[in-house]
Every structure is written in C-alpha cells, then in structure tokens.
Design a protein with these regions (language model features):
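Extended hydrophobic leader/signal-anchor segments used for secretion and membrane insertion
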Residues: 1-136
Length: 136
C-alpha cells in the first residue's frame, strides 16, 4: 500500500515537472551569445534564455531583436523608449547606442536568465545524464 502511494506521488511529480518544462519550452527559447557587445553581462559562448513577447519591456531590460544581417538576432539592452514607442538599444560594451531605434514588432523576446560559458555545456550534460538514468 505504501509502495503504491509512493509510486503514485512520484508519477504525479514527474507529470507536474513535465508540464512545467513543456510550458517553459513553449514560452521560452535558448539563444547562443555569439559576440562581445554585451560584455561583461553576457559574453560569447553564454546561453541566453529569452521569453517570448514584448509585454512589460522597460529601460534596462535585455531584448533579442531582429536586425538585418544578423540571422540569429541581436541581444542588446534597452536604454530608452522613444516618443513613438520604439526601443533605443545599446550593447553594454558599445560606447554609443545603436543607430536606429527598433519597433516593438522587431523584438523576439526578453532575457530571463543566462547560463555562463561552460555552465551551459555542464547543464545539458547533467540533464542528459538524468534523462538517461531515468530511461535505463
């Protein structure tokens, strides 16, 4: 009886974790940081996790935006919001803001957290080990 209850509780916890993970994956995406314009906050090799949407964007947020010539997009910090609602951006390592403010419809997402260089690899290796141990 106790064993059946323990199995049921574990199964419920796994289902809950799977539901949370599915929701997070549907609402967030991972972006590889490929350059140094956001250093020291983000450096090349970091893995940035961004949430979809533009709600609640404010000065100081780091956003992923579409930029011509940059297929993966650009991660830069919001330094101002213009009178017409466009975002003035600047990379933390850049001395001046980007030339053209971007409209909200160019925003792909807002930075939620990041995994520093090396930690991303370790995280996914650990995740793979956990999944493998559960399957065997």
């Amino acid at each position: 009886m106790k064993r059946a209850r323990a199995v049921a509780v574990k199964a419920a916890m796994v289902l809950l974790a799977a539901a949370v993970a599915a929701w997070a994956l549907a609402c967030m995406k991972a972006v590889y940081v490929g350059g140094g314009s956001m250093s020291p906050a983000l450096i090349a090799g970091d893995l940035a996790i961004v949430r979809d949407g533009t709600s609640g964007i404010k000065v100081g947020d780091v956003v992923l935006v579409d930029k011509p010539g940059w297929p993966a997009g650009v991660l830069h910090r919001v330094v101002a919001v213009t009178f017409d609602g466009r975002l003035q951006l600047r990379g933390d390592a850049n001395p001046t803001p980007d030339l053209d403010p971007v409209p909200l419809d160019a925003v792909r997402g807002v930075l939620v957290f990041f995994l520093p260089t090396g930690h991303a690899i370790a995280f996914f290796e650990a995740l793979a080990r956990v999944v493998q141990s559960r399957l065997t």
